[in-house]
């Protein structure tokens, strides 16, 4: 079991103050989520950390069983320009990566971050892993792993709704798997 107090200091030091510890077995992995990636996301097949470049759903489910704890991070934002969301989420993903690194250096060698959205560490992604400019920083999103974010976060008491307009408040969620 992770030292919650020490890890929570790391989370807060990296600007992530809204989080909940959870049992990774509570993460809902569903086929419909991957289907939505395939037929609804412009990143499908265009990004190293997106399907079909990710493991199949059975392996994704198995991944969550190999950890004793997970942390769900909540980020809330309202932006004037819809295009600003890319810079906003890149900053969040950078923080999640820093948390993963700090957890690793604290002895949690299995720690892995899951980004809030498709990996945008370098801005313009490539579809082939051998061409990835930042392979040690690339991470999938929950949806890329088949995670039903709506169902999972609601189980923990967080709010999430389908947004109908870009001027609505966004709720984004990332994760840290830790052992």
Segments predicted by a language model, with ranges:
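TRNA-binding/sensing appendages of the translation machinery
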Residues: 1-22
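Catalytic cores of enzyme domains
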Residues: 18-47, 51-179
């Amino acid at each position: 079991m992770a030292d919650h107090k020490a890890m929570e200091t790391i989370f807060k030091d990296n600007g992530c103050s809204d989080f909940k510890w959870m049992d990774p077995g509570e993460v809902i992995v569903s086929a419909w989520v991957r289907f939505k990636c395939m037929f609804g996301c412009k990143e499908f097949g265009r990004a190293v950390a997106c399907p079909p470049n990710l493991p199949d759903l059975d392996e994704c489910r198995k991944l969550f069983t190999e950890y004793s704890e997970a942390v769900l991070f909540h980020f809330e934002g309202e932006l004037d320009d819809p295009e600003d969301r890319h810079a906003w989420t890149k900053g969040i993903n950078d923080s999640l990566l820093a948390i993963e690194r700090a957890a690793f250096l604290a002895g949690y060698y299995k720690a892995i971050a899951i980004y809030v959205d498709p990996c945008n560490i370098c801005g313009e992604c490539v579809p082939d892993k051998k061409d990835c400019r930042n392979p040690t920083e690339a991470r999938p999103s929950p949806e890329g792993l088949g995670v039903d974010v709506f169902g999972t976060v609601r189980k923990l008491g967080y709010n999430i709704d389908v947004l109908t307009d870009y001027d609505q408040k966004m709720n984004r969620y990332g994760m840290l798997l830790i052992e």
